[in-house]
Every structure is written in C-alpha cells, then in structure tokens.
Swiss-Prot record:
<dbReference type="InterPro" id="IPR027018">
    <property type="entry name" value="Hemolysin_E"/>
</dbReference>
<dbReference type="Pfam" id="PF06109">
    <property type="entry name" value="HlyE"/>
</dbReference>
<dbReference type="GO" id="GO:0044179">
    <property type="term" value="P:hemolysis in another organism"/>
</dbReference>
<comment type="similarity">
    <text>Belongs to the hemolysin E family.</text>
</comment>
<protein>
    <recommendedName>
        <fullName>Putative hemolysin E-like protein</fullName>
    </recommendedName>
</protein>
Length: 93
C-alpha cells in the first residue's frame, strides 16, 4: 500500500508540474496574442487613414476635373462671344 501511495504521489506531483507548465505556456500565449491584437489594431488604423487619403485624393481629383471643365467652358463661351476659336470644340447635342 505504501508503494501505491508513493506511485499516486509521484503521479500527482508530475501532473501538478505539467499543469504549472501549461499555465505558464498559456500566460505566454495570452501575452503574445495581446501583442498581436495591438499590432493588428495599429495596422487597422493605418489602413483606415490611408483609405481616407485615397478617397480624399479621388475627391480632390474629381473636384479639380470639374473646376477645369468649368474654366474651359467659360473660356470657350468667352471666345465664342468674341468670334475666336474655342480651346476645345464641344459638339452641340
């Protein structure tokens, strides 16, 4: 019976050490995951910022095209009123 108790004690000591090591490994994994989640958050923020600037540039380009077209149309109308050739011939619709 004494040998069985020693065997049980040995088993539980080994099991306890295994559980302690597992807890350490789990804590280390949690720390790594927390670090990775933070890194992903930074990437997400940078992506959103970049997307904003891309959208902003697209908007600015669109507004620039509209302004340029208005300027060309205004110049063409001015030149037509004064009998000069327009910058770009615009087909009448």
């Amino acid at each position: 019976m004494k040998n069985k108790l020693k065997s049980a004690l040995s088993f539980f000591t080994t099991l306890s050490n295994t559980v302690k090591q597992a807890n350490k490994d789990i804590d280390a994994a949690k720390l790594k995951l927390t670090t990775e989640i933070a890194a992903i958050g930074v990437i997400k923020t940078e992506t959103e910022t970049t997307r904003f600037y891309v959208d902003y540039d697209d908007l600015m380009l669109s507004l620039l095209k509209e302004a340029a077209q208005k300027m060309i149309n205004t110049c063409n109308e001015y030149q037509k009123r004064h009998g000069k050739k327009t910058l770009f011939e615009i087909p009448e619709v």
